[in-house]
Amino acid sequence: MKTLRKALLATTCAVVALSATTYVSAQRGQRPLSNVEPVRHLVYIATPGDNGTDNQSGVVVLDADKDYSFLKRISYELPASKMPGPKVSGITVSLPLQMLYVTTDGWMKAIDLATDKVVWTFNGESAPVERTRGAASGCCERPWTLPDGKTLLVGSSYNSWWYYIDGATGKSLFKLPTPEANVAHNLAVTADGKLAITGSMSSPKNGKAGVAVLDVPNRTVLRYMTFSEMVRPLTINHDGSLVYVNVNDLVGFEIGDVKTGKMLKRFEAPGDWKGKGYSHGIGMTPDESEIWVADPVNDLWHVWDNPGDGRNPVYNASKTIKPSAGVEHSWIDMTNDGKLALLGDSVVIDVKTHKEIAVLKDEFGRRIVHTEKALFLNFQDGKLIEANNQFAVGDAKAYAARMGTKTSEQQ
């Protein structure tokens, strides 16, 4: 009998406690814990790709929790006469502003994630074109959201400066000239927002640098870096001390020391590729244990193990990835937890096994040919709570965990 009374008492207390918790949550304007929605994992893909060859327009949204099934296509609100729109050049988001930003060869648009409506359009400004396909408007190449979540660093359209853009209004706050790296294209920014490593499609054959290192807060150029050929995609390690770049005429990559501005080493992939093409895709796992490099000549991705401080990668043939879609529109970004990689040819890879797990398709079941400009976005209760970035860069916490050390924040 005593046992029964104890059980009844315990049950009563539990019910009272749960009721109290629910009441307090309601008074604070919070949902009861039992009603909190699970996190949703979505993929946002900005289209069209190069020259509109994928017959796509707008931002395609897929549900990663349901085998990447189609959810929605967000319109750029263009008239039919301007469809499908210019080639997309970049994508980023702001958590504080709950905004999605898409850049193209001609304009940049901000989209409210709560309504999926265009909030503003930045059209750049008239400028001499430095390179074929550059937009006469001067807008825009890759964007990056700075740590304040409200300011964007955005490349001019294959031109000689970088914009600082107000994420709320689309107003140009500042233009930082980079005359020695005068064909703005790619960039990566350190987590603390102090350094930007910006890639330029300018050639050392013409006496120009391939990378400009920017002091972001002070809006100045610290130094330029030159590699063996024109720089293509790039990535950086956790603190921005090393930059890894693809260059013309190389299936592989080169490493540069950001502090000294010097190129350190060159790594060539095995196989028959010389004179046939070059890598256009490079990234690393968040813990920096692996470097992935595209090989469009042989339709595969090479993987280098990356021990120690990241200056001496070791090629690992056993990890080679052969996507079913091939390797043409090469790019790579990874989820923040390092579990998934999204390749630029519509394929999702399980990072641990190096195996393909999905091919991304639109509402008509067509493979989305160009997925270079895509993000993994996590939502809860309709709010964006986490985002990765366009470039598979190193992460300080993941790197420290692998190395058994502490980050500067943890020390």
Locations of the language-model features?
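Sec/Tat signal peptide C-region and signal peptidase I cleavage site
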Residues: 22-26
